[in-house]
């Protein structure tokens, strides 16, 4: 009996050690899997965002040099721009994956000139909350950003509209995050949401 008791005690200690080792090993594996999944999702979303940034800034720059857009600001005639943008938005919807792209033209004093998706709403002052437009006016250079606006948080590419160096206004390509959410679910079976700091 004196011999058996220490053996039983050692066996119990050994079993506890094995269980603890197994438990911590499983915990580490789970943590590693979670970390790897998290990193994969981060890289995936970042790549998706960069693709959208490229689309936004490239098209904003192209539209900023569009004849109809420039003429509409020079003549203060919104109908000219509406005509020019009609074919562009049609092409987006029919020939690209970016079905919900929106185009917004601003005046040089940072007021809404034409929202192609809502032409009846214009003239509102954007200077108090649209910091990207102010930056483009100051630098006369295009940029991309995620920013809050009247339509909520969206990804934007903003470019200056210039005529022989004179700043006439700016144009932005606006995209939602819908395609990223859809693609992440389809490709990774992951649910993605986009949040912003309340202060913004």
Language-model region placement:
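Conserved beta-strands of PAS-like sensory domains
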Residues: 152-186
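Extracytoplasmic/periplasmic sensory segments of membrane signal-transduction proteins
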Residues: 36-45, 52-142, 185, 196, ...
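Residues in well-ordered beta-strands of folded domains
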Residues: 6, 174, 193-195
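Generic short beta-strand
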Residues: 103, 158-159, 192
């Amino acid at each position: 009996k004196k011999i058996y008791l220490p053996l039983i005690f050692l066996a119990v200690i050994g079993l506890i050690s094995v269980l603890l080792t197994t438990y911590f090993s499983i915990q580490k594996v789970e943590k590693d899997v979670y970390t790897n999944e998290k990193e994969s999702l981060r890289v995936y979303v970042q790549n998706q965002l960069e693709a959208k940034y490229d689309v936004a800034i490239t098209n904003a720059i192209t539209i900023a040099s569009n004849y109809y857009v420039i003429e509409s600001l020079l003549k203060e005639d919104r109908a000219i721009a509406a005509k020019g943008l009609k074919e562009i938005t049609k092409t987006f919807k029919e020939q690209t994956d970016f079905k919900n792209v929106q185009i917004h033209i601003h005046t040089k004093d940072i007021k809404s000139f034409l929202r192609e998706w809502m032409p009846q709403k214009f003239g509102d002052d954007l200077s108090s909350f649209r910091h990207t437009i102010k930056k483009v006016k100051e630098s006369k250079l295009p940029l991309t950003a995620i920013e809050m606006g009247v339509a909520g948080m969206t990804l934007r590419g903003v470019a200056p509209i210039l005529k022989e160096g004179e700043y006439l206004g700016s144009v932005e390509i606006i995209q939602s995050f819908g395609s990223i959410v859809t693609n992440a679910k389809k490709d990774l079976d992951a649910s993605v949401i986009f949040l912003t700091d309340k202060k913004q």
